[in-house]
Amino acid sequence: MILADYFRSEHDTAWDIAISSGVRHGVIRLPEDGKFDYADKSHWDTLVKKFTDFGVTPVAIEPMPNELHDHIKIGDGKRDESIKRVISMFPHMRSHGINTICFNFMAHIGWLRTADSIEERGGAKVTGFDLEDFKPIDKRITKEQLWDNYEYFIKAVIPYAEK
């Protein structure tokens, strides 16, 4: 068993706390700045080096990037392209010893928050939800569509994930 923590793609105080607590393995978030190319080995090399130089060995990716995940879950016109982009990540993940990618099939939106920096005791920042601040999206998906899209995704990626 290994002790791992969640690391955002950019260094923040959580990185320092994890290292000072003895954490040496990371569940990492990929950059979602539009510049990170999931299919580009050099981008993966640079990202992984940033973590290893800090003393953290990446062991898993979480979440699957939302710009891919959302199209796959709702099964829109970018679904197949998004699945290909996910599959293109696998060889680079493997080459760095990252054998796990976390995904969810919650109906379109994963974890829903309306605030991400509410101050609590001792100045700690927490997330929150306030119905008055919630702006509903105009997308609907049935349970059957979601299950169909899940099956489509799994059948597409498993042959590549098992390599």
Where do the model's predicted regions map?
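Active-site beta-loop-alpha junctions enriched in small/polar residues
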Residues: 6-10, 29-33, 63-66, 105-108
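Short, acidic/polar
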Residues: 7-20, 40, 47, 81-91, ...
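N-terminal ordered "arm"
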Residues: 12-35
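Conserved, mostly hydrophobic/aromatic
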Residues: 18, 26, 51, 93, ...
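Conserved beta-strand positions in the central sheet of alpha/beta enzyme cores
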Residues: 26-27, 60, 102
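Glycine-rich, proline-tolerant flexible connector loops at the mouths of alpha/beta enzymes
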Residues: 29-46, 107-112
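Aromatic-lined substrate-binding rim segments of carbohydrate-active enzymes
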Residues: 38-55, 77
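Active-site acidic/histidine proton-transfer and metal-coordination neighborhood
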Residues: 72-163
